[in-house]
A protein has these predicted regions:
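Short, well-ordered alpha-helical segments in soluble proteins
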Residues: 25-28, 32, 42, 58, ...
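Electropositive phosphate-/nucleotide-binding environments in soluble metabolic enzymes
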Residues: 60, 103, 107-111, 124-139, ...
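Carboxylate- and glycine-rich phosphate/diphosphate-binding segment that chelates Mg2+/Mn2+
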Residues: 67-175
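C-terminal charged capping/lid subdomain of soluble metabolic enzymes
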Residues: 218, 225-301
């Protein structure tokens, strides 16, 4: 950037290229700091050059978020989060995602769904606007993700998914994410599991584990996507079941084959440190509960 005397960042790609560019921008304005020392909230606090984000996947929402997620040398993921890292412009062009392979379409789409659902379940940081953004994203994803998966050249479905990813990203930037992400980051760090795949598998498992604490809001989402049962609990359970069914229809597994039993204590420790006390989740997990949920997500040996 300095050698070529650039005057802005133009990033075309998925979440990883965008986050890498955000990290570069942070180091550009904080030249005497290491990236790891900027981990956490509001540690950059400098205006970065104009940042233009052009997503080619509909998933991370990085084109509208404050965060850059980085994998450290110890394989642990951490986030550099600052308001200055929100891109100034986002260009949502569906033609750029038309050639995305079906499995990446599915995984990134479920990443966006996870952002929307976890933001919607946020206990403290939600506003009317973030709830509306999350609701809109969930409805759009339920309507358009599988269509985009089956027909990648369908530009209306691609455009709808890009907008849903943007809305979900905007929602969780204000309302935050939750325990699904805390566990997913450990899988990405230790095993290189694609973030969208990790979220897709974990989302129904964690929602089920939340139990009654999540039923009222999940029931509301169920109603919005056309699921109406006799009680809030039944509607919430049906919503979770439909997430599992969506995964199955798109070839996403319901468990992980990669998790080694000896890694679970470390994964639980990392997830617990990430989630607490930052994530405003319906149910606060201690390390033991994280370990139980991770074990539940592991395929039978």
């Amino acid at each position: 950037y300095r050698i070529d005397r650039c005057d802005c960042f133009l990033v075309i790609g998925g979440g990883s290229p965008m986050d890498a560019a955000k990290a570069a921008a942070a180091l550009l304005v904080r030249p005497n700091r290491s990236l790891s020392s900027l981990a956490g909230l509001l540690k950059v606090r400098r205006r970065i050059p104009p940042f233009i984000a052009v997503p080619t996947t509909a998933g991370t929402g990085s084109e509208t978020t404050i965060a850059a997620v980085i994998t450290g040398r110890d394989h642990r993921k951490y986030a550099v989060s600052d308001l200055c890292l929100i891109p100034r412009y986002a260009i949502l062009d569906p033609t750029l995602s038309a050639g995305l392979p079906p499995h990446i379409t599915a995984e990134t789409g479920m990443d966006a769904l996870t952002h929307a659902v976890e933001a919607y379940l946020s206990r403290f940081y939600n506003t009317r606007k973030t709830r509306e953004q999350a609701e809109r994203a969930v409805v759009t994803i339920f309507s358009h993700l599988e269509r985009a998966y089956r027909d990648g050249a369908s530009l209306p479905d691609r455009a709808a998914m890009l907008q849903a990813s943007f809305d979900a990203g905007a929602a969780f930037t204000r309302a935050s994410v939750g325990n699904v992400h805390a566990i997913a980051h450990t899988l990405g760090g230790l095993y290189g599991t694609a973030h969208g795949l990790a979220n897709a598998v974990l989302l129904p498992i964690v929602l089920e584990d939340y139990g009654a604490a999540a039923y009222p809001r999940l029931a509301r989402l169920a109603h919005l996507v056309g699921i109406q049962e006799a009680s809030a609990e039944a509607s919430a359970r049906a919503f979770i079941a439909e997430i599992r069914a969506m995964n199955a229809r798109m070839g996403i597994p319901d468990h992980f084959d990669c998790i080694r039993s000896e890694d679970i204590p470390l994964m639980a420790s990392w997830a617990c440190r990430e989630a607490n006390p930052v994530y405003p989740v319906p149910v606060i997990y201690d390390q033991a509960r994280f370990a139980r949920v991770i074990e539940r997500s592991r395929a039978e040996p």
